[in-house]
Amino acid sequence: MRPLRYVALGDSLTEGVGDPVGNGWRGWAALLAGGLAEPSAEFTNLAVSGAQTRDVLETQLPAALELRPDVASVLVGVNDTLRSTFDIEKIAQRLDKVYESFTRQGTAVLTACLPDPGTMLGLPGVLGNPLARRQRAVNTVVHTLSERYGAVHLHAVDDPWIMDRAMWSSDRLHPGERGHRQIALRFHAMLRHRGIGTEVAPAAEPEFPPPTKSASLLWLATAGTAWVIRRCNDLLPQLVRLAAVEMRHRARGTSDRLDVRAALSVSRALAALSVQGPMGLAEQRLVTEPMGLPEQRSFPEPQPEPEAA
């Protein structure tokens, strides 16, 4: 009997950025793998810093399917929100294909709703709101599709530890070792509820001391700054435009229109997906939820309002 096989897909969060061990990264997925099987699980981490949903679908998924994993984690989408090419309909289509592919193989899929970068960076509202709106859209898609495919879903965006600064690395975008351990612990508990994993959960306390203040500042001034520039270089002009739109609607008292449009886009994105159930066994109707809420419920499609002159 072969050991349990776990494959991790995603971006820098799953790659382990923020949890340095030796000359590389460890991260929550590696910590979780240690509690999935005895003596050990076969763990493959395909996550790459900067990956978007397209990268997961076109590059990481084929490699993962060849391994025929028992468990696969798919945490991705934040980088999509940081690009000018953001398209919630395409994101929904890609994630639907990824989740369905694993479900057809009988793989248990792990997913998560994540906080938006603007909130974690403490951006002012006119800059942070557009990013928050995008991340809520991604989270709504992830949550709805997770319900559809029976994924092991972590609604991390509302967890109290998210706002604990001690859980985050110096860049405020990636968890530190404590934060990575919290993610691993929560996934381990949910997997145990489904009969997967050992009784020994990943430790909550860090194994290594946190980086010194000087080391953190050095990282931010070198690798951290380069990381932000690489992720956001094509978004900055658009973010300025989005901020201008935000300010105009705020001045007119019509900010809610932006939320309505975002919700409408999510509704259309999910409605465009096939209603055929996983593996073709039954039909399902995808319904959206109010963006950012964990409960699954029907959500009447909002009607667009005309743009104010």
Segments from the language model and where they lie:
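Short amphipathic alpha-helices and their capping/turn segments at secondary-structure boundaries
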Residues: 1-2, 57-68, 94-104
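Oxyanion-hole/transition-state-stabilizing segment in secreted/luminal serine hydrolases
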Residues: 15-19, 53-90, 116-117
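Conserved catalytic region of serine esterases and O-acyltransferases that act on ester linkages
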Residues: 148, 171-174, 178-309
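Alpha-helical scaffolding segments of alpha/beta enzyme cores, especially the outer helices
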Residues: 31, 90-93, 97-104, 137-144
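Alpha-helix N-cap and loop-to-helix initiation/capping positions
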Residues: 23-24, 86-93, 126-134, 171, ...
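A short helix->loop->beta-strand "cap" motif at the edges of active sites that frequently abuts
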Residues: 104-108, 151
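Substrate-gating cap/lid alpha-helix
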Residues: 121-155, 177
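Serine-esterase "nucleophile elbow" of acetyl-processing enzymes
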Residues: 1-49, 61-68, 273-276, 280-282, ...
